[in-house]
Amino acid sequence: MLNRPSHIRPVCYRLNDKTLEASLQSSMGLHELEEVDPSLADGHRIFYEREVPFELRSAQGNEEPREVGALEAIRVKILALGDEGAFTGLRVELTSESNLFFHYVHELDIAGFKKLQQGQNLMVDFAEYPSVMVRNLDNCIKQPHSHLAVLVMKRDGSARLDFIQNMEYKFIELLSIDLKASAEEVVRDQIAYRYNAMKNRMALMQARLADVNALVKIKNPSLLLQLKKASLS
């Protein structure tokens, strides 16, 4: 954010049609960018997307890791297939900004959910399962000392995500889901998308900044000079 000198009063201008059109075109560009997301290619739509603190652990063979893992912010994307309230499929994608090749997926349909439901005695149906996931993830964000998300990764590419509640006197496992590392071509497509998305967003922001500079230069050239000096100080 620019530090505006105290003697400069804020100046407001009414946007003309061309400026408004440029703003709309920028918004359309971002919308079109979302449409090429490979995660949405098979009809899924984004249900939830946030960064969540995860404890990452690496397992050797079938032995459970005993040491506490590293804490890292993992971006969680939940994608649903079908109409709201009548989902036919669900996919959870885990990615990391610090490691572009980190990409784990949990996929579940109605039949797979029934096995999960029976194995963990879940008292919800498949339509409510996404909300259960969201509640656990949000609890890990809002109450990190009492709600934990532990991701245990194995060498064969399989992984398990455990949602755990710390009750002071004991740990309670709320939910456990299986994931697996994505195939190389999937990871490659995801990296290409994220790179191009960032590149296009930067281009859109640079174009918008150029439009603002041009408008201020016409309306108030001295203000533009003062803003540039303030940004350099």
Roles of regions detected by a PLM:
Residues 44-46, 84, 105, 114-125, ...:
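Short amphipathic alpha-helical molecular recognition features
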